[in-house]
Amino acid sequence: MTYPNIDPVILDLGFAKIYWYGLMYIFAFISAYFLAKSRIKKSSQWKLNELEDLIFYGAIGVVLGGRLGYIFFYNLSDFISNPAIIFEIQNGGMSFHGGLLGVIISMVLFNRKYKRDFFITMDFVAPLVPLGLGFGRIGNFINGELWGKVSSSSYAMFIPQENISRYPTQLYEAFLEGLILFVILWLYSSKERSRMSTSALFLIFYGLFRFIIEFVREPDQHIGYLAFDWITMGQALSFPMILLGVYLFMKSNKNASIS
C-alpha cells in the first residue's frame, strides 16, 4: 500500500482555509448527536434540549481538554517557548487523554446544571464517543501524523515523502478504537445494564486497544520512551484507564441501580 498524500486543506477561500482535520471533528459531533437522538427515542429520561446541551458541553470539553492535554502531556516545552501554538489546532496536536479529562469536567458541570447522576450520564455518553475517535484518527492519517514504526511488513504503508514504509497506526486505531469499540459499547448498552458498567467497558477496551497499538506506533520524537525502552506516553496514560475500568466494572456488578 502507498500513502495517497491527501492535501490536508479541503478548500482554500483565500481569507480562510477549511481543513480535513477540522471537518473530522464536525463529523464526530454530528454522529454523536444523531446516535444520541436515536437512543432517546426509546427513553423518556432525556429531553431534546438536554441532549443538545449535552453535545455542546461535550464538544467544549473535547476541544479544550484535547488541546490542553496535548500541550501538557506532549508539547509543554514548545508551548513555553511559543504560547501561540496552542491556537494552531489545524496542524493536529490533540490528546485523547486530555479530551477525556475535558469531557469528564464538562459532564460534571452538565450534571450539576440538570441535577443528573454523573455515571448514568457517562453510561449514555460512552457509546456515542468511539465513532468520533475513529473520525479523529482518519484526520491524523490525512495530516500524515502519528505514524507507526518503520517496517517492511505487508501490513505497512509506503510513504513516498520519506521513502520508507511504516505501520499506518492511525488506521489501526480508527478501526479498533473507532469501529470495534463502537460496536461493543452500542450492543452492550442496547439493554439495561448496571450503573457504571458501560463507562467501565469504554475505559477498559479503549485502554487495551491503545496500549497494544502503541507497541507499533512511533513514539513522539521529543519524548521517546518513558521507561525500559518500550513504555510510551500513550501506554503510561492508558494503563490507569484499564485499571480504573476494571475497578468500576467490578463495582458496578455490586450496584443494583440501572443505566
State where each predicted segment sits.
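A feature for loop-to-transmembrane-helix boundaries and adjacent hydrophobic helices
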Residues: 1-259
